[in-house]
Amino acid sequence: MAAAVNLELDPIFLKALGFLHSKSKDSAEKLKTLLDESLARGIDSSYRPSQKDVEPPKISSTKTVSVKQEPKTSSSLPSGNNNGKVLTTEKVKKEGEKRPADKMKSDITEGADVPKKPRLEKPETRSSPITVQTSKDLAMADLSSFEETSADDFAMEMGLACVVCRQMTVASGNQLVECQECHNLYHQDCHKPQVTDKEVTDPRLVWYCARCTRQMKRMAQKTQKPPQKPAPTVVSVAPAVKDPLVKKPETKLKPETTFLAFKRSEVKASTVVSGNSSSTNVSSSATSGLIGWAAFAAKTTSAGPSTAKLSSAAQNNSGKPATSSANQKPVGLTGLATTSKGGIGSKIGSSNSTSPTVPLKPPPPLTLGKTGLSRSVSCDNVSKVGLPSPSSLVPGSSSQLSGNGNSGTSGPSGSTTNKTASEPSTSPSASLKGPTSQESQLNAMKRLQMVKKKAAQKKLKK
């Protein structure tokens, strides 16, 4: 109620200041009477007896007018006027009170005073009910509403209340849980799905709300997708770097030959199981001079054993050169699907080169000392002639097979068929690839890995 008392006392102090600053001689007496009567009766009655002392008959007439006008003015005025309006009305009253005091001393006629006194009391009647309403009704209502709203707003601003229900109540099975990502508080029952007691009590557990968990899953999926895309590009870059160096006519089969180079490890195991492990090991050690050429042949022609079979069959069938050369090209395409049969085809082709009755004789003759010499000669021919003329490779290798495998009978037939077999581009690489299978595969694998590493480093630099 201290605030209410201050609001009621403000107009009285303003009146007192008006009397102090006035130049009239009776201002001191009026000030005393104003204070005494205002303390005894209140604001409305304090002003009227001071006027009665001066002129009792005239104020009686004005009193009735002011009483009639009080309910009208109080009802017409709004209840929510500010203190600024009250101050302005009180200033008007001060000026009005100065004038009648001076006029009463100078003995001005009654006709001039009567119309002015009701005007003086009208602003007083307006100001008095306003101060009462603002002090009692409005002040208490504003304070109570402010306290209620400010407590809720303060709790929400500080993050002490649940985001869903906006309350701070905590029960045994319904505690407030804080999300470690967004730092919002949720009741166990308000959050969907409901939070278990184990998740609340366990200090090791980091709890996230449902919205944050969804966002974290999306971010994890986005980060996993980009590294998956460059993986196939690395595989496609590796053959593109190597294959143009090896052979230009077979550029269409670049991506497929790289995958078959990995699968040839199974073919290698099948040849060892067939009973020729000793012969293949010796032949691989004896043919170390052709490791580089065999590695190139392993990448470019994946169906090498099948083409070797056709070239050796062409050596026996000397009367059909055109058909053998024509058959080698489509088999080079279809041999991509028959990788598992490559080892068996190479064995059958090598047996056909010597004689159809003796099955597995050609691999042991390849390990003789003469074969190494013939291979070195064939390598010299390659170095002199170069890659574009592969016919120089065929006579040395095919004569080696025919001369060592079948002493004198198949020699001329081999020389005649070499002229016909020199036409296709796949025959020289296939005839060279037959003897060296293990080391060529290892070298091919190593070179593929090196190219992949280089491609990966280039991408990281970019």
UniProtKB/Swiss-Prot annotation:
Q: Which SUPFAM superfamilies match?
A: FYVE/PHD zinc finger
As for subcellular location, the record says: Nucleus
Please list the residue ranges that the record marks as compositionally biased, kind Basic and acidic residues. 88-125
Stretches for region Disordered: 39-132, 305-462
Which SMART domains does the UniProt record give? PHD
One of the record's GO cellular component terms: nucleus
State any GO BP term from the record: snRNA 3'-end processing
Which spans of this chain does the record mark as coiled coil?
A: none
Phosphoserine PTM positions read: 128
Zinc finger PHD-type: from-to: 159-215
What GO molecular function terms would the record report?
Answer: zinc ion binding
Post-translational modification summary for this protein: Dephosphorylated at Ser-128 by the PNUTS-PP1 complex, promoting RNA polymerase II transcription pause-release.
- Ranges of Low complexity compositional bias? 347-358, 382-431
Name the residue ranges with Polar residues bias. 59-86, 305-328, 434-443
User: Where does the record place Basic residues bias?
Assistant: 449-462
**Where on this protein does the Glycyl lysine isopeptide (Lys-Gly) (interchain with G-Cter in SUMO2) crosslink form?**
68, 254
Domain of life, per lineage: Eukaryota
User: Which keywords label this protein?
Assistant: Isopeptide bond, Metal-binding, Nucleus, Phosphoprotein, Ubl conjugation, Zinc, Zinc-finger
Cited function: Component of the integrator complex, a multiprotein complex that terminates RNA polymerase II (Pol II) transcription in the promoter-proximal region of genes.
How is the subunit organization of this protein annotated in UniProt? Component of the Integrator complex, composed of core subunits INTS1, INTS2, INTS3, INTS4, INTS5, INTS6, INTS7, INTS8, INTS9/RC74, INTS10, INTS11/CPSF3L, INTS12, INTS13, INTS14 and INTS15. The core complex associates with protein phosphatase 2A subunits PPP2CA and PPP2R1A, to form the Integrator-PP2A (INTAC) complex.
Q: Which family does it belong to?
A: Belongs to the Integrator subunit 12 family.
Q: Please report the name of this protein according to its UniProt entry.
A: Integrator complex subunit 12
Organism, as annotated: Bos taurus
